[in-house]
């Protein structure tokens, strides 16, 4: 699939999210109207209010929704009541306001549980050719999550350089090493102030990854998680990908952090730096351990030295900036 069709798919995901949001808003209106009916059964009133109070919480909305659905189904069944004969005569359908609204709730039962929306993509899409779409989705301030698998290169189309490609890395269209630094997508997203942002790396800190995913899912707004993802184009043994991820974080090549706007609302610093002080003595060894960098040193040793130094300086400057903002 080409990048333009991928961007179109992600825009459709947002449209789907907006459609679900509108349908759930209509469902909430029906529930409010239902529990406002004087003769509505107490069980439905109680379950309906519980669902309204928790409709934006994934787990709680599911539990409350099941109670409300059961109460509505029981409420429209008039077996054993004084209205049973007329109810049966009418095809087991009561046309009163309460029963009519209860049936509408039952018809929309698939909307009772809050839906989780995740958009997945690579760095070529998120940083580069589809960035306009990513930015548009984040700017809408909708409850949608984006997970970017950052390989720092266009992996699916043959290894072309992207705006995520760091200084000195060899890729198609950058055969002599990329001369500009990596785009800081996370910082750009944070500038909105209302976007949850996290930079993660699975094997380097699994707990931080899970915490970021959990916080992003719980946050009632847009979320962006950027995950370091080793790729065959890096020129490494992919069986050792998890070890390579840890090396990247340990030496400071990849910085772990979480930016949670909810903390700012509590008067706290929204940025949490999860990376430890980088072991910079291992930085150049990390670069030279990957073919995407090592091949540049073989072909253009003089150029490579300067670009590798700039790569390290860029990474350490980024860490220092995030450390300062987190203090």
Model-derived regions: residue spans:
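Aromatic-anchored, charged helix-turn/loop surface patch used as a conserved interaction hotspot
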Residues: 9-77
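Catalytic cores of large soluble enzymes that bind and process phosphate-bearing ligands
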Residues: 19, 126, 174-181, 200-208, ...
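Predominant activation on well-ordered alpha-helical scaffold segments within soluble catalytic domains
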Residues: 28, 100-103, 135, 183-190, ...
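Amphipathic alpha-helical binding modules
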Residues: 77-105
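Conserved phosphate/anionic-ligand binding catalytic regions in large, soluble enzymes, centered on
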Residues: 93-98, 124-136
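Conserved acidic/glycine
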Residues: 106-115, 242-327
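Glycine-rich ThDP/TPP pyrophosphate-binding loop and its adjacent helix/strand module
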Residues: 113-118, 128-143, 149-277
């Amino acid at each position: 699939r080409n990048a333009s069709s991928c961007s179109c798919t992600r825009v459709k995901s947002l449209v789907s999210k907006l459609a679900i949001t509108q349908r759930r808003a209509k469902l909430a209106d029906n529930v409010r109207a239902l529990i406002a009916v004087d003769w509505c059964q107490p069980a439905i009133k109680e379950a309906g209010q519980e669902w309204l109070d928790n409709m934006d919480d994934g787990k709680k909305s599911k539990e409350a929704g099941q109670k409300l659905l059961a109460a509505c189904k029981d409420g429209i069944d008039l077996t054993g009541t004084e209205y049973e004969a007329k109810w049966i005569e009418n095809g087991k359908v009561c046309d009163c306001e309460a029963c009519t609204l209860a049936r509408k709730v039952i018809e929309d039962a698939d909307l009772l549980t809050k839906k989780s929306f995740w958009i997945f993509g690579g760095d070529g899409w998120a940083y580069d050719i589809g960035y306009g779409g990513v930015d548009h989705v984040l700017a809408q301030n909708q409850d949608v999550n984006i997970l970017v698998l950052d390989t720092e290169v266009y992996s699916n189309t043959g290894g072309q350089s992207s705006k995520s490609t760091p200084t000195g890395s060899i890729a198609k269209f950058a055969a002599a090493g990329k001369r500009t630094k990596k785009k800081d997508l996370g910082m750009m997203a944070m500038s909105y102030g209302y976007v949850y942002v996290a930079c993660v790396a699975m094997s380097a800190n699994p707990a931080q990854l899970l915490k970021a995913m959990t916080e992003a899912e719980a946050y009632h707004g847009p979320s962006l998680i950027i995950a370091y993802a080793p790729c065959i184009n890096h020129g490494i043994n992919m069986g050792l990908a998890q070890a390579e991820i840890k090396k990247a974080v340990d030496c400071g090549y990849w910085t772990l952090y979480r930016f949670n706007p909810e903390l700012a609302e509590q008067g706290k610093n929204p940025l949490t730096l999860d990376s430890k002080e980088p072991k910079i003595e291992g930085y150049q060894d990390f670069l030279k351990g990957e073919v995407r960098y090592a091949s540049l040193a073989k072909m253009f040793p003089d150029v490579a030295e300067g670009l590798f130094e700039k790569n390290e300086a860029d990474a350490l400057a980024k860490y220092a900036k995030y450390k300062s903002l987190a203090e």
